[in-house]
Amino acid sequence: MDGAIFLQQVVNGMSLGGMYALIAIGYTMVYGVLRLINFAHADVMMVGAFSTLFLFSSVGLPFGVAVFLTLGLCGLFGMLIDRVAYRPLRQASKISMLITAMGVSFFLENLFNVLFGGSSRFFSAPDFFNQTRAFGSVIITNVAWIVPLITVLLLLAILWLLYRTRYGMAIRAVAFDVNTVRLMGIDANRIISLVFALGSSLAALGGVFYSISYPTIDPLMGVLIGLKAFAAAVLGGIGSVTGAVLGGFILGFTEVVAVAIFPELGGYKDAFAFLFLILVLLFRPVGIMGDERLERSRF
């Protein structure tokens, strides 16, 4: 593999990794405050893709407006999921919440299967995203550089929120000790709902970017992507926002470059990502940026 092809694959890997990272942030933040793996999170990504397509293609809104409306709607939808499915089980066992999360996931997948059918739909987006730019012998699409850039900018914005605002301080406090937070008069449920809203909006954005890059959507599109995003969160150190982004980029890079090096194994590209995750966890079970000294996540 020559240098130009390798650089091309690096860009493609970073783009795919950025999509995983956006979804992984939601996994890691919800886990941080609830110690819950929200299996419905990846289906919110699917909802975001369908919502954007509907608002853009059927309603006729400008694409940017459709995306922003989708982010807001999915944020509210995430809060609704928390309010209806998870809040009544705050004091229940973790296995009860886990089963509920799986139930919400199955419900959303089957609901959209009934509403839109089980067949794949073409995701139409403005031509701008698929226009190419040449940098020497490296040719990349606009979406390939936009995704990593926006992912990094959003990471910086989230870190600012977590460490420079009182809402961020409250989020970190809930993640550390929710019972003490309640004794201090802070509405923990409100903070948890805020986390669900933020994570759901990011998942929706990840779904939009993924659908632009791989322009077919269906009600089950979130299953495999969600597993990879969860793997990215675990790889980076679940509970660490920076780790989730780092894990997403590493996973995307590994998946794309491995297939480029071994094209005959292209049918097993999904296995490369999980194999790499297993190898890392064998040597560092807490993930790359996880801290085994901390029982509670502090982001």
Task: Give a label for each model feature.
Residues D2-M19, L161-R166, I192-A233, V256-D270:
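Inter-helical junctions in multi-pass inner-membrane proteins, predominant
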Residues Y27, G60-V104, L111, L246-L251, ...:
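Alpha-helical transmembrane segments within multi-pass membrane transporters and channels
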Residues L16-G17, V138-I217, V241-G247:
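Helix-loop-helix "hairpin" substructures at the membrane interface of multi-pass membrane proteins
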Residues P88-R164, I191-L194, P215, V257-L265, ...:
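Transmembrane helix-bundle core of multi-pass membrane transporters
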Residues V11, V33-L80, V84, A260-E264:
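Membrane-embedded helix boundary and interhelical linker motif in transport proteins
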Residues M1-I23, S51, F63-A66, A92-M97, ...:
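Membrane-interfacial amphipathic/re-entrant helices at transmembrane-helix boundaries
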Residues G18, Y27-A49, F63, Q91-S96, ...:
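Short, non-helical or kinked segments that cap or interrupt transmembrane helices
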Residues V33-I37, L76-S119, L161-G168, A173, ...:
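Short loop segments and helix-boundary regions at transmembrane helix junctions
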